[in-house]
Structure formats: C-alpha cells, structure tokens
C-alpha cells in the first residue's frame, strides 16, 4: 500500500500524472521561438504564411493545498512581456477588400498571468498555422 501511495504522491505512474516531477523540469523554459503563422482575412481567398516570434515554453505553476473560499488562484503562463505589431498586405484579395493584416511579434517573454487581450490561454488552442480557408464549406 505504501509504494502505491508514494508513487501517487510523487507522480511516478503515468496513468495519474502525464509527467513525473523530474521530467517537468526538462521541458523548455518560457522563451522566444520562431514560428510560422497563417495570416487570413474575411473576403480574401488565401492564407499567407509569415515567420514571426512567439512566446512558448513551460512555466512552473503551483496549486495551494488548502483552498480558501472565494480566493482566486492564478496559474502562470508563458506570455508576452514586450511586443510590437507588423502589418502585411495579403495578395489576391478582391477589389473592395482591405488586404492589410496586423499580427504580433514578440520581443520578450515571461511567466505571468494570462492577458486575454493578447494571448490565447485556452487548454488546447488552434495551431498558429491553422487556416480557416483550408476547411471545406458545405451548404
């Protein structure tokens, strides 16, 4: 019984914990990485891939043992510290459709609270190169 409790506590079984604690420290830290993202705009027929920098990586998080009612617990995520925006003109947009698209370029990253206005903090978000124009539309 004790080895089972110990393994559950330490996260040694992959059925309960996806990563053992020692493995979590081998994940890449929160840092800038180069990433291809797909730019698209309603009314324009194609997506256009561009290379940009994004924040990606692991942030150490903790969950309090004692839960205090009505208190907020914030998990840190890898997010932008500084960023600027670039503008790109999509090719092949029909007349009357503004072809300009603005996208963020990360300059530095940190582990902090998620800012929903600049980051996607969902559990599983769309991939950066996802393109709505690639999905067939059925009437």
Curated annotation (Swiss-Prot):
Residues 1-24 form the signal peptide. GO terms for molecular function: hormone activity. Keywords: Disulfide bond, Glycoprotein, Hormone, Secreted, Signal. Gene3D superfamilies: Cystine-knot cytokines. Heterodimer of an alpha and a beta chain. Belongs to the glycoprotein hormones subunit beta family. Involved in gametogenesis and steroidogenesis. This is Gonadotropin subunit beta-2. It comes from Morone saxatilis. The lineage of its organism: Eukaryota, Metazoa, Chordata, Craniata, Vertebrata.
């Amino acid at each position: 019984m004790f080895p089972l409790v110990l393994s559950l506590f330490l996260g040694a079984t992959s059925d309960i914990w996806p990563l053992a604690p020692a493995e979590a420290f081998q994940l890449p830290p929160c840092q800038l990485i180069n990433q291809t993202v797909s730019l698209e705009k309603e009314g324009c027929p194609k997506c256009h891939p561009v290379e940009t920098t994004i924040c990606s990586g692991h942030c150490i998080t903790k969950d309090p043992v004692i839960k205090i009612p009505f208190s907020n617990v914030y998990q840190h995520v890898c997010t932008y510290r500084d960023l600027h925006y670039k503008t790109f003109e999509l090719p092949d947009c029909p007349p009357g459709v503004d072809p300009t698209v603005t996208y963020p370029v990360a300059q530095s990253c940190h582990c902090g609270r998620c800012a929903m206005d600049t980051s996607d903090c969902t559990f599983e978000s769309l991939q950066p190169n996802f393109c709505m124009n690639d999905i067939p539309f059925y009437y």
